[in-house]
Amino acid sequence: MQLLNFGLLLLPFVAGDLAPQPEPLLAGPSDVVPGQYIVTLKEGLTSAQIRDHKKWVSSVHRANLEGFAAGASGVETEGIMKHFHIHDLNMYSGGFDEKTVEDLSRNPYVKSVHPDQHVYLAKTVTQRQARWGLGYMSSKGKPVPLHSTLVDYSYDDKAGEGVWAYVLDTGINVNHVEFEGRAILGHNAIPNKPHTDEFGHGTYVAGIIAGKTYGVAKKANVVSAKAFDTGSSTYNYILETYDWIVRNITDSNRKNKAVINFSISGAKYQPFDDAVEKAFKAGIATVVAAGNDGKDAKNNTPASSPNAITVGAVRWENTRPSFSNYGKIVDIWAPGELIKSCWKGGNNATSTQSGTSAASPHVAGLVAYLMSTENLPSPSAVTARVLNLTIPNLVKDAKDSPNRVVYNGIQERKFTLPKYF
């Protein structure tokens, strides 16, 4: 049974330590949610077939509970819980006894049955300010000073205006001054918890995407889609939230003006990889973190989703931090060490962190920026443009990864540019 190794990708480090080490992998039997599963249905089923299937599941589950006293084990078996529909992908979560799981695995309408898993966020600590990441975005990959506050960040003044960045994370402090009223609360999947950010990570990520000081796309809107609370979640909540995002983008006619950022990475989990692929086919771009294990990202979710934009971390002098995952599945490298952004604890709070969690929103911000300046028509056009702008062969120790660093293309534009810092 495959277990999930999720850690929120902002790695802890002590003051003065410029080479953070990765958190231990969070794998073990406790990662599986006892008695809870994600069921993926085969494609091509009609609404009537899906409805009949659910009735069959309820009947079989009820009969098995009565016949085998499954509840005596202490495992919660409540039947079907939530249904997820992303493009033409249909899945549902549920609490089932072992006999029902066996019956489900043999059902002709069922593609797969996966145990639900806990998803964990790693610990974070505070570090002195560093502002090199934005300057790097417009430097064509030239090394920039780590601690300088005089680095220029040049950008088109459309700066993501009219674009929506959905942050699937721990929530966002939408009242933070960095967002200037451009952040809104979207969906909260966590039962009996307020739609706030008690952990800090979602606010941090959103600040890199669209903060007025720390953001790549300084005029973009950000939407809080909360699937984590104070350190952990399950795919039951993550899939619910991703499903809501895709529906909201579609219903709001924002497909060409929206990007999803998911700055979390863990062991391979096919149901979520499938969801990312279906969102892409529906016309929605997703940017994800490569992961912080210092290993090949091909075994990570959602980094291994073929049509996600997978982002590794690079340092200010163009070296790969030892924590950053790598490999052929990594599409692009972006600033990911000692990056300052918004934080929890107040409407002016900031923190400096490291990890591919910081790298991913730099690229999500670039996607929002390019959507506003170039009117890119599809996620495939978005990916092609982002990769076309990259600067090649700069990352030291990129392993067998495509060696491409992020660039916003501003030096090729023919007009007076605003400068930042």
Swiss-Prot record:
**BP term (GO), one:** proteolysis
Q: Which residues form the signal peptide?
A: 1-16
**Residue ranges the record assigns to the propeptide:** 17-122
- Which positions are glycosylated? 248, 261, 348, 388
According to its UniProt record, which residues of this chain constitute the active site? Answer: 169, 201, 357
Domain spans labelled Peptidase S8: 131-421
Q: What main location does UniProt list?
A: secreted
The compartments listed are: Secreted
Keywords attached to this entry: Glycoprotein, Hydrolase, Protease, Secreted, Serine protease, Signal, Virulence, Zymogen
Q: Name one Pfam family in it.
A: Inhibitor_I9
Q: For the Inhibitor I9 domain, which residue ranges apply?
A: 36-122
* GO CC annotation terms, alphabetical: extracellular region
Record keyword ATP-binding present: no
Can you tell which superkingdom this protein's organism belongs to? Eukaryota
The EC number(s) attached to this protein equal 3.4.21.-
Q: Which CDD domains match?
A: Peptidases_S8_PCSK9_ProteinaseK_like (cd04077)
Which PROSITE patterns does this entry report, sorted A to Z? SUBTILASE (PS51892), SUBTILASE_ASP (PS00136), SUBTILASE_HIS (PS00137), SUBTILASE_SER (PS00138)
Q: What class of enzyme is it?
A: hydrolase
Q: Which molecular-function annotation in GO is an example for this chain?
A: serine-type endopeptidase activity
Family designation: Belongs to the peptidase S8 family.
Q: What does this protein do?
A: Secreted subtilisin-like serine protease with keratinolytic activity that contributes to pathogenicity.
| Protein name per Swiss-Prot or TrEMBL | Subtilisin-like protease 2
**Annotated organism of origin:** Trichophyton tonsurans
